[in-house]
Amino acid sequence: MSVKVEVIEGGVPHQKIMIAGLVATIVCLYLSYLNVYTNTAYFSFFGGLAVVAALIWGSNTIKVLCSYGIGTGVPSAGMIAFGSGVIAMLLATKFGIAAPIVALVLAAVIGLILGYLSNEVLNMKIPVMIQSLTELAVVGALTLMGFAVLITGSFTFTGLTTGSVTLFGMISMPSYQVSFIGGGLVAVAFLLGSIAVQHPFNACLGPGWKQDRMLMLTAECGFLSMIVAAVMSFALVSMIAGIISLLIALIGWVYTYTQYIELSKRDAAAWLDSKPIPDVEGH
C-alpha cells in the first residue's frame, strides 16, 4: 500500500511537461541530423539540448512517482530509467534516421513491462508506476541518444561504434576502440544522465518544494553534464564542433545556475552570508 504525499502538488501539470519534453527532445535529435546534410559535426550541440529537455521531463516524472512515499526509490528510478533506456537506444541505432522514433517505441515497451512487473509481481501497487516507468525508460533512451549525438555527431550504429586513428599524420585507419561504445563513453553518459535526472527532486523535496526551482536545477544539471560530454567530444569530432557545444553548454549552465540560486533565495526562510570559521591560535 502507498500513500500519496499531497504537499508537493502544484505547478505546471505533468502532462504538459511530458508533451513539451518529448517534442523538444525529438526535434533536437532530428535537427542534429543536419550534420549528415552538411557533412560536418557543427550541429552536434542539438544532442546536448535534447538531453536537457529529456532530463526536465524525467525529473518531473520522478517527482510524480516518488510522491507516493518511496523516498529511497528516487536514485533507483534514475538507474532503472537508463538501465532500460540503454537497451532501446542501442537497438534503435540500427534503424538510421528513424532511430529516435524506434528508441521511443522500444523504450516504452520495455518500461511498460517493467512497470507491470513492479505493480503486479512485486506488488508495489503504486497507481502511476506503469506510466512513470514507461516514461522514464523513454527518457533514458532519448537522453543517451542525445549524449551520443553530442559526443560523436551521430545517432547511427556505425557512428557510435567506429572511430579512426591517424598514423604519422597522414594515414587514417578505422578503430572500434576510439568510439562512443568501444571507448566506454556510453558508460559515462549513463552515469551523467542517471545522476542528473534523479538529483533535482532529491535536492529540492520537502515542505518547501517548488516545481520551478526543481526544474531549474534539472536544467542546470543537464547543462553541467553537457559540459562534460562536450569536453569528451573533442576526441571524436572536429575542434570547431566541440568548441560550439562547449560554449553553448557553458552559457546554459551559467544562466541556469544563477537562476537556481535566485529561486533558492526566494524560497529560503533566511539567506545568511556565513563567514569562514576563524582559525584561533591555541585551539
Task: List PLM regions with ranges.
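Hydrophobic, membrane-facing alpha-helical anchors
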Residues: M1-E6, G47-L65
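Generic alpha-helical transmembrane segments
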Residues: F46-I56, L106-Y116, Q177-H199
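Juxtamembrane/interface segments at transmembrane-helix termini
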Residues: V121-K125, F157, S194-L205, S238-A241, ...
